[in-house]
Amino acid sequence: MLEIAKRTALGALLLSVMPLLIWLSGWQWQPGASGPGLRFLFWMTETVTRPWGILTSAILCAWFLWCLRFRLKPALFLLAIMITAIVAGQYTKSWIKTLVQEPRPYVLWLEKTHGVPGDRFYQLDRQVVERLVADDNHIPLWLKRHWAFETGFAFPSGHTMFAASWALLGVGLLWPRRHRKTVALLMIWAAAVMGSRVLLGMHWPRDLLVATWISWMLVTLATWLAQRLCGPLTIPPDEHQEIAQREEEKKS
């Protein structure tokens, strides 16, 4: 358990660097940024936004099962553990949001520029939200629609919890099997999703940090359960020879 906690904690620390630096710098979100970079980050956000998040989870579940190659019964246990970790994170996020009820950055901006009180905003219809910013030409249409779709509270970030959980599951489950490229890609993807939430005006840096560490707790428990119920996460002895052969082929 301790080794798992150390491994996943290192992953959580790496994911925490970006939001922590933003928080310490005192940077504040303001609308008006646009361009292909922001649009790319929007598509990163969309990989988590429903319904695409379901497809992302299905693809990642299949990839994890292929990478670990457990037999049928352990594979089913692993599938259940991974899905439970992701779903538990989303339920935890929703429960905390209803308690804290922190407004999103763009909501406070609407309050200042359009005179919509923050406490009244969450009672408005989504179409009303889109009409409020219809005349703001410096805000892209796709961002207006995203704001209208995402009218929940900010703290903590559900998108971050989803992406960070999958990235940390990669650290916990796949790193011991030397699937380092997959882990690196998952970490980069999670960091891009997290960055998109700040730059799109959806979250504060602290929302990302808290979500990351909630994910760490859930994933650490999930990885420990997977090790107990599904078998060792390290490379099986019969695969060592295959790995050695692949490394020799690369050198030659």
Each language-model region and where it sits:
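Aromatic-anchored segments of alpha-helical transmembrane domains
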Residues: 16-23, 86-92, 188-201
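Cytoplasmic membrane-interface segments at the C-terminal ends of transmembrane helices
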Residues: 66-69, 229
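Low-complexity, proline/glycine-enriched hydrophobic segments characteristic of transmembrane helices
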Residues: 98-150
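Alpha-helical transmembrane segments of integral membrane proteins
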Residues: 6-11, 73-85, 181-185, 206-210
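Alpha-helical transmembrane segments in multi-pass membrane proteins
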Residues: 81-85, 89, 93, 211, ...
